Amino acid sequence: DALGAPREDENQFLEDVIFGYGKMHEPGAVLDFQMDTGLNVIECGFFAYDDWLGASPDGLTSDGGVLEIKAPWSRRKGQEREFKSLADQPQYYAQVQIEMLCAGRQKAHFYQYSSHAQLHEVVPLDQAWIDENIPRLRQFHAEFLDIIASPDMAADYLAPKRVIIDTPEAHKMMVEYDELTQ
């Protein structure tokens, strides 16, 4: 195990570092997006849909859209590999569709950013996707509420508290992360 910890803890550590990297670069990406497009971005919070679903886009755009930014860890050193299109990342397609639904917007700006390159895709609200998937999500939500209401069932599905990784390998990775974010 590269970080000197059990595999599941190592994966969680990597996920935390990767997520932190993206959040750290979000303000610069917003500024870059505004310069590239001429659009203004307004910070926003959480948008609730009915009483069971919600989303928090990275901003609202002056043309009536939502903004979703991704700053991939894999592009941190300027590798030449191109960004994946949104069509090749269905999890993010779902994310922007739900953001538009919750925020009451008809389009999304999906902006992938690194200090070396950017990819901007404009995505319309896909009503067919909404009509097909929102009922499924509503059913999943109802089933989840049933599970967590039962302590016996919940124990099988809810994750245990995370373990803190404190190894030399983990510290080296954090030093690299700190250097990249300065």
Feature-to-residue mapping (PLM):
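Accessory terminal regions of nucleic-acid processing enzymes
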Residues: 1-182
